[in-house]
Amino acid sequence: MNSYLISSSKKSSGKTILSIGICSAIHSFKKVVAPFKKGPDYIDPLWLSKASSKNCYNLDFYNMTNSEIKNLYSRNILNADVSIVEGNKGLFDGISADGSDSNAALSKLLKLEVIL
C-alpha cells in the first residue's frame, strides 16, 4: 500500500486543500483512501472524511503514545489502497526541541513517504 504524509516548510501553505484534493481524486477512481490528520484538529478531519468517504482519525503526539499512534494507524489502513496523513505546520516544526513531535517524526514512526 502507498502511504504518504502531506507536509510543507511552514504553516498555512495549502496542505489541507492538497490533502482534500488527493483524497477526492483517489476516491473518484474507486480506490479506498484512509485519511488521517496529525494533531488535535477537528475541522480538517471533517473535510478529509468528506473527500474520501471514510472516517479520518487524528494522530496526536500529545494525547497518544507512539504505540497508540501506530496501532490506530495500522488498524485503519487494513482495507485501504492508499493512506494520506495531513501534517500540521512545517515538516520539522513542533514544541519538543528534539523534534520528536514533528511531521518528520510521524513520517519516520509510520514509515510514510513525504510529499512536501
Pin down the residues of each PLM region.
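ATP-dependent carboxylate-amine ligase catalytic core
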Residues: 2-17, 23-110
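Conserved beta-strand/loop subsegment of P-loop NTPase cores
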Residues: 111-116
